[in-house]
Amino acid sequence: MKLLKKNFLMVVVELMISNYYFVWNKKLSQEICQKLINLGKENWTRAEVDNKSIAAIRKSDIVWTEEQWVFDLVSPYMFTANERAGWKYNIVATKDCQVTRYTKDGFYDWHIDGMGSHNELHNDGNTRKLSMSIILNSDYKGGDFEMRGLKDKVPRLEEGSIIVFPSFLEHRVTPVTEGIRYSLVTWFVGPPYV
């Protein structure tokens, strides 16, 4: 019953928005993308879901970064997307930046980043409202970013492309079949929806 209630809620919420995502194609230079990849170098750790390594849901490596230049880089894109897509969510901070590496067969199955509810408050009283993913390279196959329930597929994102979307929308990264896929993922938080 709980799952049915959640699915019904998602349908209602999704009907209330007209833009599911906002994309900039090839916006960041190859040099910036490489600089972001280099944040990982030798510090990769196995990605977790709810503080557990669950290979059936996610197979990737991550590095968290608190480099100020990264926050300065991503924030203007979020504010622009929030306005132009018409979401106009109350965003107060950028929360967490993660460089992710998907090797062959790496993936992240269907998931949401946040519901914007009181049930998932971070210790600062805010919750994830917008998610951003930046593709840092193009020399891989598979590893497509997909959103569930869209009648039109998300276009293939190439190196330097940025996608911003509401954190409550279900999405995934399909298995990488060749090469290594790198991305930068970050979240933007604000007070819970009323």
Task: Tell me the role of every PLM-derived stretch.
Residues S75, F79-V194:
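Catalytic core of non-heme Fe(II) oxygenases with the double-stranded beta-helix
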